[in-house]
Amino acid sequence: TGEKPFSCSDCGARFTYRSLLRRHNKIHAEGKSLICSECGKPFTSESALTAHQRSHGGEKPFSCTDCEKCFAQRMHLIEHQRTHTGEKPFSCTVCGEMFTYRAQFSKHMLKHKRKRTEGESLDCSHCGKHFTSRSDLTVHRKSHKGKSPLQCSDCGKCFKYQSQLASHQRVH
């Protein structure tokens, strides 16, 4: 959702994670931050500033050997190369879903965190199916409109046809 609950008390910058706020706070604590002359963005290291400044000049010295696409930052090349290898190094400890990019993974984890912090159930009350986002649950609920559910008395799972319910109940 792009929620950024952690804010800097010095400048008001907002962050998704407390660790990013702590890293940002070094800019204020060290007293001598490095500032981009193009946009005024502050950095704590010379290498981070140099990598950032490439984005203004259009310089892209890192190229992919598979497709020759070029990148301003080495890390962006490394992430891109995963599209060729199929590597998905970021794994959700809650549901097991795997991700190629850290940004995708972080966004996904926010869904689980939001569910825990809000105490909100993202389970369909009609059939019990679980969802990681409120919008997916809302769309799913529409699939039940106009249906009279046949519900298992043991587990609450619903079925469209009596034969499906009977078959399911044999499992219990």
Swiss-Prot record:
InterPro entries registered for this protein in UniProt: Znf_C2H2_sf, Znf_C2H2_type
MF-aspect GO terms: DNA-binding transcription factor activity, RNA polymerase II-specific; RNA polymerase II transcription regulatory region sequence-specific DNA binding; zinc ion binding
Pfam families, alphabetized: zf-C2H2
Mapped zinc finger ranges (C2H2-type): 6-28, 34-56, 62-84, 90-112, 122-144, 150-172
Compartments, record wording: Nucleus
SMART domains in the cross-refs: ZnF_C2H2
Name this protein carries in UniProt: Gastrula zinc finger protein XlCGF51.1A
Keywords for this protein: DNA-binding, Metal-binding, Nucleus, Repeat, Transcription, Transcription regulation, Zinc, Zinc-finger
Keyword Zinc: yes
Main location: nucleus
SUPFAM superfamilies: beta-beta-alpha zinc fingers (SSF57667)
Keyword match Metal-binding: yes
GO CC annotation, single: nucleus
Family: Belongs to the krueppel C2H2-type zinc-finger protein family.
Function: May be involved in transcriptional regulation.
